[in-house]
A protein has these predicted regions:
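Positively charged, low-complexity intrinsically disordered leader regions
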Residues: 1-30
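Glycine-rich phosphate/diphosphate-binding loop of Rossmann-like nucleotide-binding domains
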Residues: 39-53, 136-225, 234, 238-249
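Short, well-structured alpha-helical segments in soluble
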Residues: 76-88
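Short, well-ordered coil/turn residues at beta-beta hairpins
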Residues: 96, 208-209, 229
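Rossmann-fold NAD(P)-binding glycine/threonine-rich loop
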Residues: 106-126, 230-282
Length: 283
């Protein structure tokens, strides 16, 4: 039976670090604050917003919402971004995506000040993931994966790591972050030939395929650590990951469950970025 890499244990440790940093800021009269920009009322956005605001409240971080109708003009949205960019009381900004089709998402994303970009929405932040510079922040989900590896003492140095998925949101940043941990990294994707033969050779597998249960027993081998980023609904309406958990779990050494794995860490990473942004500003 594989060891379960439980997100709640990682989150508890991360939250204690964040609370300590918030206390230091409060001593200086600084209240770390997240600006939340939401266009429309997509159910996924509303759900994540509830989780983010609840975590902010738990950790002593304030938030301010900027709620806009789905038919808002690009000009009006850019005005809001300019407002939060110039508001010294706002330290980090979360803008929900995707934006409505009538808005040029790239233009709007890159209008955000990089130092307030707590979920890697700007090209400046994304570039910093590859250069290692402290400009903006990495995407919250791949950083949550790294937090899990660190918490459970899984050393990446010299290890073979495979990332399934090449998106700019998870796959590519996760690969770069593993390289920074001195792993030897292979990225698999929809055009990879005989993917199971590649993934079986890995010590660490991060699965961000975006399809429920796509990674089965043939993809894994004994001794592996598997981080499942996927969040999907199965035919029974239950949350499940990109791994076929029942098939994979008996084989590997350690695995994150879904739910209860990566997703539960991501929100604390986001709030931690807000606090770090405030600390950078007033360092």
């Amino acid at each position: 039976m594989a060891k379960q890499l439980l997100g709640k244990e990682v989150t508890a440790a991360l939250n204690e670090r964040i609370k300590a940093d918030v206390a230091k800021l409060n001593e200086k009269g600084i209240k770390p604050t997240l600006g939340i920009i939401r266009v429309g009322e997509r159910p996924d956005d509303l759900s994540y917003e509830r989780g983010a605001t609840k975590r902010c409240e738990t950790l002593g971080v304030e938030y301010k919402k900027y709620l806009l109708p789905a038919n808002v003009s690009q000009e009006e949205l850019l005005k809001v971004i300019d407002e939060v960019n110039n508001d010294d009381a706002i330290h980090g900004v979360l803008m929900f995506r995707p934006l409505p089709k009538h808005i040029d998402q790239k233009v709007v994303e890159n209008a955000l000040a990089a130092e307030k970009d707590v979920d890697c929405q700007t090209e400046a932040s994304l570039g910093a993931v590859f250069t290692g510079q402290k400009v903006g922040f990495p995407p919250c989900t791949p950083q949550a994966c790294m937090e899990i590896l660190d918490f459970y003492g899984i050393d990446c140095t010299g290890k073979k790591a495979v990332v399934i998925g090449r998106s700019l949101v998870v796959g590519k940043p996760a690969a770069m972050m593993l390289i920074q941990k001195n792993a030897t990294v292979t990225v698999c994707h929809t055009r990879t030939v005989d993917m199971p033969s590649v993934t079986r050779e890995a010590d660490i597998v991060i699965v961000a395929a975006g399809r429920a249960g796509v990674v089965g027993a043939e993809y894994v081998s004994e001794g592996q650590t598997v981080i499942d980023v996927g969040i999907n609904m199965n035919e029974e309406g239950k949350l499940c990951g990109d791994c076929d958990y029942a098939a994979v779990e008996p084989i590997v050494d350690a695995i994150t469950p879904v739910p209860g794995g990566v997703g539960s860490v991501t929100t604390s990473v986001l709030v931690g970025h807000v606090v770090e942004a405030a600390m950078r500003k007033y360092a």
